[in-house]
């Protein structure tokens, strides 16, 4: 039985980079990992495979949407450290529903029996959209992980995601493993002061603190995980540490997790406004 993670967060927050590095850390610790990109721009697995791979929707179009004609090799690419990558893809811009494609991808994975092949399946899910198909990974996830930065918009999105996780937990097993503080900079922006208070307020914790560092950005543009970068890069160890920390907690199979207690949409403006 695979351990299933669903990674969410505000658009542009660094989910795909974070997801790829978590997958790499897990794989290098011996886990067989499948990362599933759930975004129409289909670049989640780029740091793992080094290319924009064929999407599930493209593969389905080639067989006129006959699921039974596809095999895992048609939709799965193997990349860094033996990690398998899959991209759900999406309809053309301005038409169709991207969430539907995510739901179709989940169905296809179940039909192919891929859940039994992996130690960890990681869903990297589009932004803070938690309606319809984009919330589907929460139906299958053991744990949700929220990526956030130390600002109001990110915290507001994280709170909305907590609402979705709380709602899904009524019918499904999903719990919130915690929040990954991304692009942490103690020289400006308060470090993690706002995120620390938010995590306490909703009953969760910070899983790790990823520093704001040019090397992380550099690795993304190079189409690599941090773990594939030159080991002589300055401060590489500091950048790798939080991802290894997350992987160790996940592989312990008993990460501290809970059902979050989100703040009301209107209430959060008053509460966050009073934080220092």
UniProtKB/Swiss-Prot annotation:
Biological process per Gene Ontology, one example term: light-independent bacteriochlorophyll biosynthetic process
Leader sequence segment: none
Root EC class: oxidoreductase
Cofactor remark: Binds 1 [4Fe-4S] cluster per dimer.
EC number: 1.3.7.7
GO molecular function terms noted in the UniProt entry: 4 iron, 4 sulfur cluster binding; ATP binding; metal ion binding; oxidoreductase activity, acting on iron-sulfur proteins as donors; oxidoreductase activity, acting on the CH-CH group of donors, iron-sulfur protein as acceptor
Binding site for Mg(2+): 16
Reaction(s) catalysed (UniProt annotation): chlorophyllide a + oxidized 2[4Fe-4S]-[ferredoxin] + 2 ADP + 2 phosphate = protochlorophyllide a + reduced 2[4Fe-4S]-[ferredoxin] + 2 ATP + 2 H2O
Cofactor(s), by name: [4Fe-4S] cluster
Record's keyword terms, sorted: 4Fe-4S, ATP-binding, Bacteriochlorophyll biosynthesis, Chlorophyll biosynthesis, Iron, Iron-sulfur, Magnesium, Metal-binding, Nucleotide-binding, Oxidoreductase, Photosynthesis
Disulfide bond sites: none
Binding site for ATP: 12-17, 41, 182-183
Top-level division of the source organism's lineage: Bacteria
Binding of [4Fe-4S] cluster, residues: 97, 131
Cross-referenced Gene3D superfamilies: P-loop containing nucleotide triphosphate hydrolases
Pathway assignment: Porphyrin-containing compound metabolism; bacteriochlorophyll biosynthesis (light-independent)
Main function: Component of the dark-operative protochlorophyllide reductase (DPOR) that uses Mg-ATP and reduced ferredoxin to reduce ring D of protochlorophyllide (Pchlide) to form chlorophyllide a (Chlide). This reaction is light-independent. The L component serves as a unique electron donor to the NB-component of the complex, and binds Mg-ATP.
Family membership noted in the UniProt record: Belongs to the NifH/BchL/ChlL family.
Assembly notes: Homodimer. Protochlorophyllide reductase is composed of three subunits; BchL, BchN and BchB.
Protein name: Light-independent protochlorophyllide reductase iron-sulfur ATP-binding protein
Annotated source species: Chlorobaculum parvum (strain DSM 263 / NCIMB 8327) (Chlorobium vibrioforme subsp. thiosulfatophilum)
